[in-house]
């Protein structure tokens, strides 16, 4: 039995960061720390999910998140099945429910779901008897990304409370931003958003963030600079004049990074648009945590699956 095995979540599912209390977040991070060490060993196996079935149901393309959940499940001993559902064939509502009912009849133990519609994962969770993990729903939430970001920050800064984190770029379309804002706020960090007004949701200040319209102001003395991918596939209108102009004002390069704290570190959830929201010199530079974020992703998802496994019958 490992040290954090007594830790549990109040619910059967992980649908979002919203609703989690600070002790649940830190409990997951503490357990993930154990899995970071396990993943660096030659033998990377635990048996928490042996004999259990995990289905990854993704209606949006994803390389890193889906492969990360697959590796996490397999390292815990689960039988993992990947189901890719073309988003054109999954209509919001009826077809999703049909899919849920069909999958439920196969008696899976854990469903990991990504869907292009906000709220779809919570809808599906109400129709099945197994644990459900939200791997990203529309522009709503991406809880495991926020958890892996928090773990990365904590390992490098030693804490989260009291830090100033600047989240920059396409906040409007970003489920990563929303989950991170809620988590960081819950753990006592100061959160700034830096974006053009066209890429900010209305009323975002209600989440307890400061909003800035220039990188120079928003990055001033920030401890962490978190860049967001410009999600051009979700943009029907003209949200930005041009990619070149966007990079000029909001792309992170060495010059803009100098406005942050001298020991500021840089993050990006990936995939990156190099030369759009971040310069390669920064992304690949000594202050970048981007590769470490990917490593932390597997550990965090193992922690989530391990914790939910203890909610399963006969666990």
Curated annotation (Swiss-Prot):
Binding site for L-aspartate: 92, 175, 229
Keyword Transcription regulation: no
Naturally occurring in which organism (per UniProt): Xanthobacter autotrophicus (strain ATCC BAA-1158 / Py2)
Protein name (Swiss-Prot/TrEMBL): Aspartate carbamoyltransferase catalytic subunit
GO BP: 'de novo' pyrimidine nucleobase biosynthetic process; 'de novo' UMP biosynthetic process; amino acid metabolic process
Gene (name only): pyrB
A GO CC annotation given for this chain: cytosol
The entry's keywords: Pyrimidine biosynthesis, Transferase
EC numbers on record: 2.1.3.2
Binding residues annotated for carbamoyl phosphate, in chain numbering: 64-65, 114, 142, 145, 270-271
Pathway assigned to this chain's UniProt record: Pyrimidine metabolism; UMP biosynthesis via de novo pathway; (S)-dihydroorotate from bicarbonate: step 2/3
Entries under Gene3D superfamilies matching the protein: Aspartate/ornithine carbamoyltransferase
Pfam families: OTCace (PF00185), OTCace_N (PF02729)
HAMAP family assigned: Asp_carb_tr (MF_00001)
Catalysed reactions, semicolon-separated: carbamoyl phosphate + L-aspartate = N-carbamoyl-L-aspartate + phosphate + H(+)
Ranges that cross the membrane: none
Subunit structure: Heterododecamer (2C3:3R2) of six catalytic PyrB chains organized as two trimers (C3), and six regulatory PyrI chains organized as three dimers (R2).
Summary of the function given for this chain in its UniProt record: Catalyzes the condensation of carbamoyl phosphate and aspartate to form carbamoyl aspartate and inorganic phosphate, the committed step in the de novo pyrimidine nucleotide biosynthesis pathway.
GO molecular function: amino acid binding; aspartate carbamoyltransferase activity
Stored PROSITE patterns: CARBAMOYLTRANSFERASE (PS00097)
Family (UniProt): Belongs to the aspartate/ornithine carbamoyltransferase superfamily. ATCase family.
UniProt key word rRNA processing: no
InterPro entries to which the protein is assigned, alphabetical: Asp/Orn_carbamoyltranf_P-bd (IPR006132), Asp/Orn_carbamoylTrfase (IPR006130), Asp/Orn_carbamoylTrfase_sf (IPR036901), Asp_carbamoyltransf (IPR002082), Asp_carbamoyltransf_Asp/Orn-bd (IPR006131)
């Amino acid at each position: 039995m490992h040290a954090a095995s007594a830790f549990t979540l109040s619910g059967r599912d992980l649908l979002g960061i919203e609703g989690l209390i600070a002790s649940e977040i830190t409990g997951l991070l503490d357990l993930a720390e154990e899995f970071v060490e396990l993943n660096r060993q030659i033998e990377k196996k635990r048996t928490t999910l042996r004999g259990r079935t995990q289905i990854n149901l993704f209606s949006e393309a994803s390389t890193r998140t889906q492969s990360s959940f697959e590796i996490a499940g397999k390292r815990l001993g689960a039988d993992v099945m990947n189901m890719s559902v073309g988003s054109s064939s999954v209509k919001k509502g009826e077809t999703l429910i049909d899919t849920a009912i069909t999958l439920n009849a196969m008696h899976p133990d854990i469903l990991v779901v990504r869907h292009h519609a906000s709220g779809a994962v919570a809808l599906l969770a109400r129709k099945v008897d197994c644990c459900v993990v939200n791997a990203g729903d529309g522009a709503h939430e991406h809880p495991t990304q926020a958890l892996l970001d928090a773990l990365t920050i904590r390992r490098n800064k030693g804490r989260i409370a009291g830090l100033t984190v600047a989240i920059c770029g396409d906040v409007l379309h970003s489920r990563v931003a929303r989950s991170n804002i809620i988590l960081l706020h819950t753990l006592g960090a100061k959160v700034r958003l830096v974006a053009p007004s066209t890429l900010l949701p209305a009323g975002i200040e209600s989440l307890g963030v400061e909003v800035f319209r220039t990188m120079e102001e928003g990055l001033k003395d920030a401890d962490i600079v978190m860049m967001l991918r410009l999600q051009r596939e979700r943009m029907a209108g003209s949200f930005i004049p041009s990619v070149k102009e966007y990079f000029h004002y909001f792309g992170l390069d060495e010059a803009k990074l100098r406005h942050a704290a001298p020991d500021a570190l840089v993050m990006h959830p990936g995939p990156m648009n190099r030369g759009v929201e971040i310069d390669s010199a920064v992304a690949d530079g000594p202050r970048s945590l981007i590769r470490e974020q990917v490593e932390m992703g597997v550990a965090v998802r193992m922690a989530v699956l391990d914790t939910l496994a203890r909610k399963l019958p006969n666990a």
